[in-house]
């Protein structure tokens, strides 16, 4: 039998067939969400792109691995090129302003992704089978056949929708799995919103990394990752594949598991203190905004002016600060926050 990475084949056997990488990323970044392809110097404010990174085995003059950055626009041109790469390629489900993949440049989160490594597998020796599969392999060091039962992966499925939310996709990355929760609407990454997302992601990570799912369930072993973490791109080589260059067997694969999710659905699985703030990207087009808010459109879009701010003299600020410091009383009508 021909198989890719073990978890990919196990998901196939569970009737979760592999999805083409382009289809997967179109689900993550719906048509029209990313900026259209433009020439190098034709940047426009208010248009955002995804950013992919590829780490090569080739070393630069400083003896460090060469890293290439690719802007992913709405036509997915560079993504098509990356899928033919033999490098370690990763990307986060986030759109960015500009070319630098930093948290300050992050604009919208399209999916929450949780990585789980070292999934629990039960192994037992068996007599020589008629043929090897992803569940039966030959152990050269012990000179015997081993049957593998992927109990960690199956435990996840038994508890999706019960103890933790059901993901939209699972990417079999080789050594583990990536759970993608694709949002029905993208979430703007304002700093206060991003903070609640980080808290939620950390909590969900702890919930998923339990002893029934992974061998690395101890607190010191759990991999808590940033909201902005990039993940191996489906269709590209796994960690083993980077050595074997076997694109048929050793590549990451995406498998459709469930529907897109809402913040409300995700929040229903955690206590109040871990919940995300409910805010979504506006559905208004620029044309609609022009009709509804003509003055704003003229000032911000046509003239390119900055957001309006209220400025006051420093002595007025100091006067109010002194009043608050000296006069504020709990329960008083002027009890306030500045």
Predicted region positions:
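Generic detector of well-ordered alpha-helical segments enriched in charged/polar residues
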Residues: 22, 26, 80, 154, ...
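Structural beta-strand/beta-sheet cores of well-ordered domains, especially the beta-sheet scaffolds
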Residues: 110-112, 229-231, 334
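Intrinsic-disorder-associated interaction segments
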Residues: 14-18, 72, 146-149, 197, ...
